[in-house]
């Protein structure tokens, strides 16, 4: 009998109940008992949803009040000193303090732990902080309490733990430098204690997640796996080692031979590893095949997956398990909530509940191939695949022909930067250290209300347009009064930097309830790319043209780049990411050319997610970087030399991609640098980056307003690394989340600092 199981389920709830409860608790509108009751109800519902879908072995421990890595930190006693309670054990207040920071109270004020991306997903985890003298102590009873809950409800459960090597890898050494592997022998006894307690609760199987096995691991970490699991094997319970987000590659032999009872592999991301693992797996081990995509929204091709399963079943028999490729945390919860999608498009989709049903039907197809439910599901799957293959909504010959006709010349500016910049400086006539902002201004309650009223039909097109024009007039007047050199229209009409454009492109669709957790209470609802992408009409031109008509100063057009549009959407699975990126690039190229034709002389194309697209394996980086830089140039290279192309990137590591950033050939790049004290510019100096740079002179993520002298000092440091004539002056990022008073105060100081530097260098 093939067994159906799940590696994890979304925790937020079908209607984001967890988010609402968290935020009510933080505001003091819900007490701890109320919050815990919401969590208990969600877990009960989610276990029932999975069981009713046909999952045999339910995950427990995938629920988290904020983040699963943070939950493990509390369980292991990895609580930074600034958050430790003065008396008694850690509490929910401790957990939320670690996640969000503490402004007062028991800790006397403490900044939150660092947050970063969970592998190459759009989920973020709280980075554990380790000291050289780190001690681990079992605390935080959540896992054991939830096992008890599930068993009391009659469920067969499989607790989920992050493995010891992955947990250490994800953390950061704080204070004195030391090797994190030195902590392994101190951490391993806790796993033994956990397994013993779970065994006493009647648990048979435990899932140990070690996704770092799909990374390029140093040899000492590979050696540590053998040492750790040789120790762990002595403890009770059957152990399923789970890997996902990629292929095991050179770690395949290591993973196959670790002394555990089963191995899970991701056959969505790395189907090529299947034949080898089948040959290398010891005869006593269970093999769990991740055949249903856990991080996208499209229905599985059941016949294709079943062919692999049937082959595996011939070799493995009872040792075959079926699962999603990874935790369903990265998928929306339940497609049945979607009541406004048309029937055809909805038939192509599967959210977490439906993915569990697909896993269950695949297992049943192995066990009972002639069962009526199996035959019906396979017939429906064939119909879905045929519908998608032939649908004119998906396949647009004109778009495909345009992509096929792209030439190398299309992604090259007409002249080299040195020639372009001379023409741009002559035409723009900007001072040394020109000042600008990154694009967005504060999104006030009145802006959000106007947008909502328009969507609900309460405002006419004319009324909404006038409301947005009023906001644009205000933004332009403020910038002129403050003395900024290059203005923006403020983006009042934009709800989100991806959604705004996706709503206007053919090939995108939106859901009502397709929410996924980004971190904590922050949920996002990514757009879905379902077909070939094109731009039926101009998207920003009228807003920017209106803004330019209000001022004699240079107005900057603002667009989101193709890579960011792709990375922050659910992509298609039937064509490659680079093909989708090229389609997006052509649509954006048309917009850039329309802006230029409307008299806009600077166009900014934001690529906030450029670095996020990097594959997990270094060997695959260059291919990605080649097409990612090419599609940026494709959307930017149709303009005349006199038109200046800007891009903005907001992350803190450039050294390993600096050549590719240069290859994008943007005339100006604006970046986050204020928190690094301009040290990030060392990468640009060492590489001799040739184009212009706007290093952010203040951190927009903080309400603090730095004074002009502080910003001037940062500019002096920047001028030591980059020639002054190539420096721009701007904030770190957009100002959407800030209030107007602090925005104006900070920009006054920024303009003052720029003027001070001009005097010094005159």
From Swiss-Prot:
Superkingdom to which the source organism belongs: Bacteria
Binding sites annotated in the UniProt record for 5-methyltetrahydropteroyltri-L-glutamate: 16-19, 117, 522-523, 568, 612
Gene Ontology BP, a term: methylation
Active site: 701 (proton donor)
Any matching Pfam family: Meth_synt_2
Metabolic or biological pathway: Amino-acid biosynthesis; L-methionine biosynthesis via de novo pathway; L-methionine from L-homocysteine (MetE route): step 1/1
Cofactor annotation remark: Binds 1 zinc ion per subunit.
Cofactor(s) listed: Zn(2+)
EC number(s) from the headed UniProt entry: 2.1.1.14
Catalytic activity: 5-methyltetrahydropteroyltri-L-glutamate + L-homocysteine = tetrahydropteroyltri-L-glutamate + L-methionine
GO MF entry, a single one: zinc ion binding
Binding positions for L-methionine per the UniProt entry: 438-440, 491, 606
Enzyme class: transferase
Purpose of the protein: Catalyzes the transfer of a methyl group from 5-methyltetrahydrofolate to homocysteine resulting in methionine formation.
HAMAP family: Meth_synth
Protein name: 5-methyltetrahydropteroyltriglutamate--homocysteine methyltransferase
Species, as recorded: Pseudomonas fluorescens (strain ATCC BAA-477 / NRRL B-23932 / Pf-5)
